[in-house]
Amino acid sequence: MKREGVLYILSAPSGAGKTTLCREIIDIFPQLRHSVSYTTRTPRPGEIHGKDYFFVSMDEFHRMIDADEFAEWAEVHGNCYGTSIRTLEENRAAGVDLILDIDIQGARQLQERFAGGVYIFILPPSFEELRRRLNGRSSDSDEVISRRINAAAGEIRESRWYDYIIVNDQFSRAVEELKSVIIAEQCRTARVLDAVSEIFSMD
């Protein structure tokens, strides 16, 4: 029996480093695929359509909402983000594990819709460090940075319902902790019992 693919959902305040962590962990686990979200925001320097995000107009995004094409979607800091339900269902059925880089609103929607997801919250070491990282983004205005900092406190409070919390202070350590979570989840009894039962003829 083919194992169902696992959804690894990463959320964090903007600037905590979850996108960079996602990219790094996919290099470590080649069988793990990144679920590319749709967004209405403007691409940042170096971002590639279809790899980092599917960049679409607000009209196209709302057409997809009306057509019930999203497993989850949310408006965050004035921009819309969404995950294709078809992408999730096809990959899970094929036994492909996906890593999703999404906000708290979207994570809540997925929790209600899909069982067995692994929810991981990435924290910055402090608000001061978060502000420093956001200030390093040339694409964000002072107004946007202030709005993200103000939103971070509420977002961090939501971390209590996630399965795991990783503090991204030293990046290499955060990578190792995320790697450990994925390895542990791959060994979870509920995920491997069917395969083990077939091998050892367990009743």
Swiss-Prot record:
Belongs to the guanylate kinase family. Pfam families: Guanylate_kin. HAMAP family: Guanylate_kinase (MF_00328). Essential for recycling GMP and indirectly, cGMP. Its EC number is 2.7.4.8. SUPFAM superfamilies: P-loop containing nucleoside triphosphate hydrolases (SSF52540). Its main location: cytoplasm. The keyword ATP-binding applies. Residues 5-183 form the Guanylate kinase-like domain. ATP binds at A12, P13, S14, G15, A16, G17, K18, T19. This is Guanylate kinase. It catalyses: GMP + ATP = GDP + ADP.
